Curated annotation (Swiss-Prot):
The gene is slc25a28. GO terms for cellular component: mitochondrial inner membrane; mitochondrial membrane. It is a multi-pass membrane protein. It is found in: Mitochondrion inner membrane. It comes from Danio rerio (Zebrafish). Pfam families: Mito_carr. Keywords: Ion transport, Iron, Iron transport, Membrane, Mitochondrion, Mitochondrion inner membrane, Repeat, Transmembrane, Transmembrane helix, Transport. This is Mitoferrin-2. The lineage of its organism: Eukaryota, Metazoa, Chordata, Craniata, Vertebrata. The keyword Phosphoprotein does not apply. InterPro entries: Mitochondrial_sb/sol_carrier, Mt_carrier_dom_sf. Ubiquitous. Expressed at low levels throughout the whole embryo at 24 hpf. GO terms for molecular function: ferrous iron transmembrane transporter activity.
Amino acid sequence: MTADTSSGDAAVAGASAGAEIHWFGGRFWGVSESLVGTLTPRISGEPDLHVGHFYGSQEASDLSEPDYEGLPQGASTSTHMLAGAVAGIMEHCLMFPIDCVKTRMQSLQPEPAARYRNVMDALWRIMRTEGIWRPIRGLNITAVGAGPAHALYFACYERLKKVLSDIIHPGANSHLANGAAGCVATLLHDAAMNPTEVVKQRMQMYNSPYRSVLDCMRCVWQREGALAFYRSYTTQLTMNVPFQALHFMTYEYLQELLNPQRHYNPSSHMVSGALAGAIAAAATTPLDVCKTLLNTQESLAVDSVSRSGRHITGLGHAFRTVYRLGGLPAYFKGVQARVIYQMPSTAISWSVYEFFKYMITKHQHEKRRIQRDAEK
């Protein structure tokens, strides 16, 4: 689908199953009607408009569009949930092979065949020795969990960010509010995502004994009980609360520098998301290593610390086990893969989220404008 701008107006023609997105002057020009209806994205040369501000005549005000950051009028909670769900699914699906490598590189006592030099070496060897589909084993359960988890995550964050900002720093952005909103949103996200993480990481491990996702879920339930799906929840929160607080504060700070008007700007969302993800990922890698150990209950690690084969339980137990088996360097196993995963992952997540939030909000505005015109 292409946009015809020869007369100075942008029109979206035809309908397609996907979206063909063209970058021009930092703007998206084409978008599938199947996703958000017949839309006219803003093009370079159009005036930047804010919520509650209109320029020119009444006709110009009818054609104006709200700033997509205008939460009360511009984007409802359902908009944030829909945009967040799509962003979460795309983020996890596109980056899943790297996530598989990260899980394996965090193994404390890997088999000789599962010792990798770097991310690319790991990907190549996994596909060559275990099959081309092995790096995406467990993708289905991840996609199922990522949708609702990210819907809650972004909707909660956007709502609390505004409420807390109005309390802490009325009329302006507050980094403290951003961090606090990110922490609370993480509680909901991890509650929905933690069982998925347990199954996913067990499917990703080298020589995983499970035939399928359902087989893994049944075995974990029968052998370890229902609580096994939340064994790493406190560790996950201990890792993700500071991760998301740092992530959101860094993202919002970079947005103030790169996009001070807070308009829809794909390049600034991508750069801010990538840098925020990289910084937060590197800082919280030790906690991620412990979370992986708690989720996978890596057999060699468990056997080496307990002859009885007792499960590793709790963050303190995991920290002691990691140090006993590998010393301080073990806390940063897989840091390269984690940063490589998080940079594009958060860039994709924020870019897709902001894109859909912008387009859905614009579509809602267009519908309201058409309704007003019909009533005249």
